[in-house]
């Protein structure tokens, strides 16, 4: 049965992509009124969930996004949360140093918080739940990234939530 489901999913997706005037609106009608140039006015948390990953690449991936958000003049509306479940003491020490230096470098432009849990309770979902309990009420929106994610500032700024406040509700 999974092969049949996969086939029809691909077939319907192909037909929508091929024949719909706007494929995104065809599958998400709420996107119809979104221009993509809406002014950013809401507080957004960007969550970077990590576990036992060397921080060099993550810092390299974050830097262009941070620079783009600061250059757009909206850095004060974003807060980066590095949510670590790292169990390896050596990697944890490196995370603390690298993300501490990153936070110091961007101190006056974009807030960066590094938090490490000693216990990996609930795995990644538990990591995000812990964020929601501690800081969730401080933000209107959240974008979740994995350790290997790369997202440009333009992609973050094109997010759809400001355009249609009920999308995702």
Regions found by a protein language model. Give the residues of each.
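Internal catalytic domains of large membrane-associated glycosyltransferases
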Residues: 5-169
């Amino acid at each position: 049965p999974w092969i049949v489901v996969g086939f029809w999913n691909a077939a319907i997706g192909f037909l929508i992509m091929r024949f719909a005037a706007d494929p995104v609106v065809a599958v998400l009608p709420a996107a119809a009124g979104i221009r993509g140039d809406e002014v950013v006015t809401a507080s957004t948390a960007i969550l970077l969930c990590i576990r036992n990953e060397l921080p060099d690449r993550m810092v390299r991936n974050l830097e262009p996004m941070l620079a783009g958000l600061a250059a757009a003049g909206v850095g004060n509306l974003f807060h980066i949360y590095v949510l670590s479940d790292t169990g390896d003491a050596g990697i944890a020490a490196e995370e603390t140093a690298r993300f501490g230096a990153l936070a110091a470098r961007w101190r006056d432009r974009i807030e960066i918080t590094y938090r490490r849990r000693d216990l990996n309770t609930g795995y990644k979902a538990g990591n995000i739940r812990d964020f929601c309990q501690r800081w969730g009420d401080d933000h209107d929106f959240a974008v979740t990234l994995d350790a290997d994610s790369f997202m440009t500032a333009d992609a973050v700024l094109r997010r759809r939530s400001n355009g249609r406040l009920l999308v995702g509700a």
